[in-house]
C-alpha cells in the first residue's frame, strides 16, 4: 500500500523545528515518527541527522545554486532542498527517486507551485556536483562546525583538533553494556556470535562491547530480558570509577535517562540508589530502564542546586554527578548540538556546574567518593572546573585516574572508541 505521507517533507519540518525553533531532534522526532512505518523511521532519522551533520556544506551549495535565500514561511522549503542535496551526495537512494520524492514534498507542504523551483535547483546541482563539492572541500564549510566551536576546539587541542572534528562528523559506533547480573561479557559475546552479530570487547571498560555494524535493539539477544543495554563505552567509565559497594547509600544526580543508575545497580545490586533529575519527563525514562532491567532505585525530581529540598539532611557514601554540560563530546550522536549551542552557553554552563558541585559536596560523607562527569571536551567545564573546586576545598583530594589529563580523565571521541567524556574522582577527607 502506498504511503499517505511524504517523508522528505516530514524531515524538512523536523529540521525547521531544530534550526528555527531551537528544539532538539530527540524532542522533535518521536512525535513525527508515530505516523510513519517502522521502515521509514530509520530513513527519517538518517535524513534528519545526516542533514544536520553536514549542514554547512549543504548551505554553501545552496548559496551557489540560488540567487536569493528562501526566508520566512518559505524557509521550510530551503530545508527540503537541503534534504534533497543530502540524499544525492550521501545516500544510495537512486537519484531519480530522491528527486521525485523531494520535489513532491512541496505538495505535502501545501506549496505545489514551488515544485518547479525545487526540481530546478536539485537538477542544477546534479550537473555541477563534482565541481561544487570540490570547491566546498576547500573552504571553511568542510569543517562542518560553527566557527565559535571550531575556534574553541582548536584552542583546547592544537594537535588533535582535526581528529576531533573528523570523529564528530562520522556516524557513531554502537556500544553495549553487558549486564553482569545475567552474563559475563565473554558469554554475551558468544550469544552475539550465535546471532550472527559481530562484536568486539573494549580494552579498558569491562562491560563494554562494540558492534561492528549497528543493529536494531530487537535483534540483540535478551534485550527485553535486561541482558544488555545500549550505552556508549565512555559513559560506562563513570560507574567503573565510582566503584559502588554493596550496602552503600549512593546518589546519582542528573540521572536521566538512567544508564548510569542501572549500571550502578548491576555493579553492586545491594546498594541503595537515589536517582535525581530536574526534568520530570526525562525521569520517566529512568523508570522505564529500571523496569526493563528489573532493578529498583528511589527516583525523585530535584534541582541539584537545592539538595535539601529532595534529600533533607541525608548524606551519601558515593555521589555520581553527571553534570549538565555543552555535550560537545557527543556531537556525532547528536549533530543538532552544533546548531543549538551558542558560544555564550559555555560560561553559563560552567557557572551552573559550579553551583551544583558546591551545593552537593556537603551531602558526601567524610571518606566518601564523588565522581564529577560531563560529556564535554571543553576545559572550562572539565579540568578548569575541578581546578577551581580544589582551590576552594582543601578537604577534597583528586584520585589519579591513570590518564593523560593531570586533572581527571579526558576522553576524546574516536571512530572505534567511545564518545568525548570527562571524569574526575574526588575523595572527601
Curated annotation (Swiss-Prot):
GO BP: any one term: rRNA base methylation
Catalytic activity, EC: 2.1.1.176
Subcellular location(s) per record: Cytoplasm
Active site residues per record: 375
Reactions performed catalytically: cytidine(967) in 16S rRNA + S-adenosyl-L-methionine = 5-methylcytidine(967) in 16S rRNA + S-adenosyl-L-homocysteine + H(+)
CDD domains reported in the protein's UniProt record: AdoMet_MTases (cd02440), Methyltransferase_Sun (cd00620)
GO terms of molecular function: RNA binding; rRNA (cytosine-C5-)-methyltransferase activity
Descriptive protein name: Ribosomal RNA small subunit methyltransferase B
Organism of provenance: Yersinia enterocolitica serotype O:8 / biotype 1B (strain NCTC 13174 / 8081)
Amino acid at each position: 500500500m502506498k504511503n499517505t505521507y511524504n517523508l522528505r517533507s516530514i524531515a524538512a519540518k523536523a529540521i525547521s523545528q531544530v534550526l528555527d525553533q531551537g528544539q532538539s531532534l530527540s524532542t522533535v522526532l518521536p512525535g513525527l515518527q508515530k505516523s510513519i512505518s517502522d521502515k521509514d523511521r530509520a530513513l527519517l532519522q538518517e535524513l534528519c541527522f545526516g542533514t544536520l551533520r553536514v549542514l554547512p556544506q549543504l548551505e554553501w551549495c545552496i548559496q551557489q545554486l540560488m540567487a536569493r535565500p528562501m526566508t520566512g514561511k518559505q524557509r521550510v522549503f530551503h530545508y527540503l532542498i537541503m534534504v534533497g542535496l543530502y540524499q544525492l551526495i550521501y545516500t544510495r537512494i537512486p537519484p531519480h527517486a530522491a528527486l521525485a520524492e523531494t520535489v513532491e514534498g512541496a505538495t505535502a507542504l501545501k506549496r505545489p507551485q514551488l515544485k518547479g523551483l525545487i526540481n530546478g535547483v536539485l537538477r542544477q546541482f546534479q550537473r555541477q556536483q563534482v565541481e561544487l563539492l570540490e570547491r566546498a572541500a576547500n573552504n571553511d564549510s568542510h569543517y562542518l562546525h560553527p566557527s565559535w566551536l571550531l575556534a574553541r576546539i582548536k584552542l583546547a587541542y592544537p594537535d588533535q583538533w582535526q581528529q576531533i572534528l573528523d570523529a564528530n562528523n562520522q556516524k557513531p559506533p554502537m556500544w553495549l553494556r553487558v549486564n553482569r547480573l545475567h552474563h559475563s561479557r565473554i558469554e554475551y559475546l558468544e550469544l552475539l556470535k550465535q546471532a550472527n552479530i559481530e562484536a568486539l570487547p573494549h580494552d579498558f571498560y569491562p562491560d563494554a562491547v562494540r558492534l561492528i555494524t549497528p543493529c536494531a535493539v530487537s535483534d540483540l539477544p535478551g534485550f527485553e530480558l535486561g541482558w544488555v543495554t545500549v550505552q556508549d563505552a565512555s559513559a560506562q567509565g563513570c560507574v567503573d570509577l565510582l566503584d559502588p559497594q554493596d550496602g552503600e547509600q549512593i546518589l546519582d544526580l542528573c540521572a536521566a535517562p538512567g544508564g548510569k543508575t542501572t549500571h550502578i545497580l548491576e555493579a553492586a545490586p545491594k546498594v541503595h540508589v537515589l536517582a535525581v533529575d530536574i526534568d520530570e519527563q526525562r525521569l520517566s525514562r529512568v523508570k522505564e530502564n529500571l523496569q526493563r532491567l528489573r532493578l529498583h532505585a528511589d527516583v525523585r525530581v530535584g534541582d541539584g542546586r537545592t539538595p535539601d529540598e529532595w534529600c533533607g539532611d541525608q548524606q551519601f557514601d558515593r555521589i555520581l554527578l553527571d553534570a549538565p554540560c555543552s555535550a560537545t563530546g557527543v556531537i556525532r550522536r547528536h549533530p543538532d548540538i552544533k546548531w543549538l549551542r551558542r558560544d555564550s552557553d559555555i560560561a553559563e554552563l560552567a557557572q551552573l556546574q559550579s553551583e551544583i558541585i558546591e551545593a552537593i559536596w556537603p551531602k558526601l560523607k567524610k571518606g566518601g567518593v564523588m565522581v564529577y562527569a560531563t560529556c564535554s571536551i571543553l576545559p572550562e567545564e572539565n579540568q578548569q572546573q575541578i581546578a577551581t573546586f580544589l582551590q576552594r576545598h582543601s578537604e577534597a583530594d583528586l584520585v589519579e585516574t591513570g590518564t593523560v589529563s593531570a586533572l581527571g580523565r579526558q576522553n576524546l571521541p574516536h571512530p572505534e572508541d567511545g564518545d568525548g567524556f570527562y571524569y574526575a574522582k574526588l575523595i572527601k577527607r
